[in-house]
Amino acid sequence: MRDIKIFYPSDVKLHMDALESFNVPLNVPMIDLNEGYSSCEICVTFGVPKKAGHRGELVKKIFDEHKGRHLIIEKGYINRDVYYAIGWDGINGRSNFNNKNSPTGRWDQLNLSGFKTWAHNNSSKIIVCGQVPWDASVQHINFTEWCIKIIEVLKDCGDVVFRPHPLDHGSVKFLM
């Protein structure tokens, strides 16, 4: 087996539980983020470095020292309380999930009923979905400014509706 180490935050139960479960078949060393980096070929973390918060700083130190591949675990995109996304060297669209040409079986097993085919008609609204400004996926931009600009551009294409993230309590309310 390759040299794999899992770096965990001892103060975030959700992250700890996910990483421990991930480690069951691997049985590789787990190292508290507070202990710092330990050399390995593959580094596993829950999430990526964040500009905000102590945990984000600790993960950044691990990323800065590690020269090999990163396997990153994050909460999934659907049924987020049940599923996780696991990808190489990034999150969201910047990760390699090794899912090219995957069969539809896993997707079909989700039995998701709320999804409809894409509707193309002139009466549809364009929905811009918000994000909490401290999320790692938007930490590299001014998210409020981005929302303002993208809504302005999209207004030429039809009615735009902004929906804030359910956990965002006010940072972009003026867009609604």
Regions found by a protein language model. Name each.
Residues 3, 123-127, 159:
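Charged active-site motifs of nucleotide-sugar-dependent glycosyltransferases
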Residues 1-50, 134-135:
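N-terminal pre-catalytic "stem/leader" segment of glycosyltransferase-like enzymes
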